[in-house]
C-alpha cells in the first residue's frame, strides 16, 4: 500500500467580533410601541361596549312602583277601592289577578289591621 498521509481535523473556534445589535432594546423601541398600539386597537375593537359601560355613568332606571306610592286604598261597602293613581282621576275598584273586583266581607277591618286609623297607601300593602 502506498503511504497515504493522515489528515487531522482540529476544531477551530472563531470568536465573533461583531456586536449583537439585533438584540438591543434601544433599537426596537418603535417596534414595541407599535405592538402596544396594535394591542390597544384590538382591545378597543373587541371590547368597545364593555369599555363604554365601564366608563359611562350608570343610567338610573325608574322604578315602576314609584308611580303608585301616592295611591291609597279605601273601602266602599265590601268593595276595595283605589284612588290617587296618576293616570286616573276618579276612584276605581281594585282588581285581583284575574281582573275581577276585590270584594271582602270585612274590608274596613282589614284596612285598619294594616295601618291602624291612618289611610292605607298602596305602598304599605306592597311592602308587606
UniProtKB/Swiss-Prot annotation:
This is Entry-fusion complex protein OPG094. It is found in: Virion membrane. Most cysteines are linked by disulfide bonds. They are created by the viral disulfide bond formation pathway, a poxvirus-specific redox pathway that operates on the cytoplasmic side of the MV membranes. GO terms for biological process: fusion of virus membrane with host plasma membrane; symbiont entry into host cell. Keywords: Disulfide bond, Fusion of virus membrane with host cell membrane, Fusion of virus membrane with host membrane, Late protein, Membrane, Signal-anchor, Transmembrane, Transmembrane helix, Viral envelope protein, Viral penetration into host cytoplasm, Virion, Virus entry into host cell. It is a single-pass type III membrane protein. Interacts with OPG086. Component of the entry fusion complex (EFC) composed of OPG053, OPG076, OPG086, OPG094, OPG095, OPG099, OPG107, OPG143, OPG104J5, OPG147 and OPG155. Except for OPG095 and OPG053, each of the EFC proteins is required for assembly or stability of the complex. Component of the entry fusion complex (EFC), which consists of 11 proteins. During cell infection, this complex mediates entry of the virion core into the host cytoplasm by a two-step mechanism consisting of lipid mixing of the viral and cellular membranes and subsequent pore formation. Disulfide bonds join 75-107. Pfam families: Pox_L5. Belongs to the orthopoxvirus OPG099 family.
Amino acid at each position: 500500500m502506498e503511504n497515504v498521509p493522515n489528515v487531522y481535523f482540529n476544531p477551530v473556534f472563531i470568536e465573533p467580533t461583531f456586536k449583537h445589535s439585533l438584540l438591543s432594546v434601544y433599537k426596537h423601541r418603535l417596534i414595541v410601541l407599535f405592538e402596544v398600539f396594535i394591542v390597544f386597537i384590538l382591545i378597543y375593537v373587541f371590547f368597545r361596549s364593555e369599555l363604554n359601560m365601564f366608563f359611562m355613568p350608570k343610567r338610573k332606571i325608574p322604578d315602576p312602583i314609584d308611580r303608585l306610592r301616592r295611591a291609597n286604598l279605601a273601602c266602599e261597602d265590601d268593595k276595595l277601592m283605589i284612588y290617587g293613581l296618576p293616570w286616573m282621576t276618579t276612584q276605581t275598584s281594585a282588581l285581583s289577578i284575574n281582573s275581577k273586583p276585590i270584594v271582602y266581607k270585612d274590608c274596613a277591618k282589614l284596612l285598619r289591621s294594616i295601618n291602624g286609623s291612618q289611610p292605607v297607601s298602596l305602598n304599605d300593602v306592597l311592602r308587606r
